Curated annotation (Swiss-Prot):
Pathway: Carbohydrate degradation; pentose phosphate pathway; D-glyceraldehyde 3-phosphate and beta-D-fructose 6-phosphate from D-ribose 5-phosphate and D-xylulose 5-phosphate (non-oxidative stage): step 2/3
Active site per the UniProt annotation: 126 (schiff-base intermediate with substrate)
Family statement: Belongs to the transaldolase family. Type 1 subfamily.
Known role: Transaldolase is important for the balance of metabolites in the pentose-phosphate pathway.
Subcellular localization: Cytoplasm
Designated name of the protein: Transaldolase
InterPro entries xref list: Aldolase_TIM (IPR013785), TAL/FSA (IPR001585), Transaldolase_1 (IPR004730), Transaldolase_AS (IPR018225)
Any one GO molecular-function label of the UniProt entry: transaldolase activity
Keywords of this entry: Cytoplasm, Pentose shunt, Schiff base, Transferase
HAMAP family (UniProt xref): Transaldolase_1 (MF_00492)
Length: 317
C-alpha cells in the first residue's frame, strides 16, 4: 500500500518544519523550514548541544545576536546536507517593524551561507508579513535573495507579498484554526468546522485561488498544522511544511489522499485584485481581528524565544 505521505508528494512539495535535522532523512522532504522557536527547542536536546557549544566557543567575545546568526547558519548547513532543496532561515522577529535592518540582516545571513560554500539559490530568508517585512522582501528579491513571508494570516498580507515579488508565503493554517476555536469556546463544533470547512484550510484555499487567478509566481506553502486532516485537505498546494510528528502520522497511514487544490480547477475565483498601498494594507489587516492578533502574538513569541536563546548563549560563555 502507498502511504498517505507518498500520495501527498504526488501533488505537493513536502517540506519538513523542524530544527531537529536528525529526523529529516526518514521522511525525504524536498525542503526544510526553521524558526527561532524550533532552533531553541533543538539546542536544548543533547544531540544538538555540541553545535551550540562550538558556536559559542568559536565566537565567545561576540554579541549574542552575532552568535545566533552563526547558530542559524550552522543548523541550516547541516539541514542542507540531508535535503535536495532549500532551507528557510528566519530574520530576528525583533526587526519585524524595521525595513532597513531586516534588509541588512537578510544580506548578512546570505553572506554567511555563501561564506560556508552554500549558494543563495538554496536559501529562503524568512520575514514576518508586516508592511515593513514585505518592503524588505521587495528589496532583497531584486538582489536575488529569495524570501519566505511568514506569520501570514490574511489575504491582504498574501496579496502584498505577491505584489512585492516574494518567492514564497507561509500561511499559518493551525494558528488560524486555534483562534476561531478559542473564540467559539463551548460553541465550537468540530464536525461542522473541520475538514474542508476548517477556517485555516479555507484561508489557504482562498489565497491559492487568488494567486492562480491573477497569475502570481509566488509559491504558496501551507504551514502550522494541527492535524493530518488539515494537511490532506490542502493536497495540491504548491508546498506544505509539516512537523516531524505529523510527517510520521502520514507515513504510518494508508488512507487515500486526493488532490484538493489545482490551478486547473479553481472555485470562487476573485474578480478584483486586493488594494495594497500602505494605508489600505494597514486598514484591511486591522479590520481582520484574527490576522491582527495572530501576527502580533507570533512576533511576540518568536521575539521572546530569541531572548531565551540569547540568555542560553550567555550562560555558556
Amino acid at each position: 500500500m502507498t502511504t498517505a505521505l507518498d500520495q501527498l508528494k504526488q501533488y505537493t512539495t513536502v517540506v519538513a518544519d523542524t530544527g531537529d535535522f536528525q529526523q529529516l532523512a526518514q521522511y525525504k522532504p524536498q525542503d526544510a523550514t526553521t524558526n527561532p522557536s524550533l532552533i531553541l527547542k533543538a539546542v536544548q536536546k543533547d544531540a544538538y548541544k555540541p553545535i551550540l557549544e562550538k558556536t559559542v566557543r568559536d565566537h565567545r567575545d561576540e554579541p549574542a545576536d552575532f552568535i545566533i546568526d552563526r547558530l542559524l547558519i550552522a543548523f541550516g548547513t547541516e539541514i542542507l546536507k540531508l535535503i535536495p532543496g532549500r532551507v528557510s532561515t528566519e530574520v530576528d522577529a525583533r526587526l519585524s517593524f524595521d525595513t532597513q535592518r531586516s534588509i541588512d540582516k537578510g544580506r548578512e545571513l546570505i553572506k554567511l551561507y555563501e561564506d560556508a560554500g552554500i549558494g543563495r539559490e538554496r536559501i529562503l530568508i524568512k520575514l514576518a508579513s508586516t508592511w515593513e517585512g514585505i518592503r524588505a522582501a521587495e528589496v532583497l528579491q531584486k538582489e536575488g535573495i529569495k524570501c519566505n513571508m511568514t506569520l501570514l494570516f490574511s489575504l491582504v498580507q498574501a496579496a502584498a507579498s505577491a505584489e512585492a515579488g516574494a518567492q514564497l508565503i507561509s500561511p499559518f493554517v493551525g494558528r488560524i484554526y486555534d483562534w476561531y476555536k478559542k473564540q467559539a469556546g463551548a460553541d465550537w463544533d468540530e464536525a461542522k468546522n473541520g475538514g474542508a470547512n476548517d477556517p485555516g484550510v479555507q484561508s489557504v484555499r482562498r489565497i491559492y485561488t487568488y494567486y492562480k487567478t491573477f497569475g502570481y509566481n509566488t509559491e504558496v506553502m501551507g504551514a502550522s498544522f494541527r492535524t493530518t486532516s488539515q494537511i490532506t485537505e490542502l493536497a495540491g498546494c504548491d508546498l506544505l511544511t509539516i512537523s516531524p510528528d505529523l510527517l510520521q502520522k502520514l507515513q504510518d497511514s494508508n488512507d487515500t489522499v486526493e488532490r484538493k487544490l489545482s490551478p486547473d480547477a479553481l472555485h470562487d475565483k476573485p474578480t478584483e485584485r486586493v488594494a495594497i498601498d500602505e494605508a489600505s494594507f494597514r486598514f484591511q489587516l486591522n479590520d481582520e481581528a484574527m490576522a491582527t492578533e495572530k501576527l502580533s502574538e507570533g512576533i511576540r513569541v518568536f521575539a521572546a524565544d530569541a531572548v531565551k536563546l540569547e540568555k542560553l548563549i550567555d550562560s555558556l560563555r
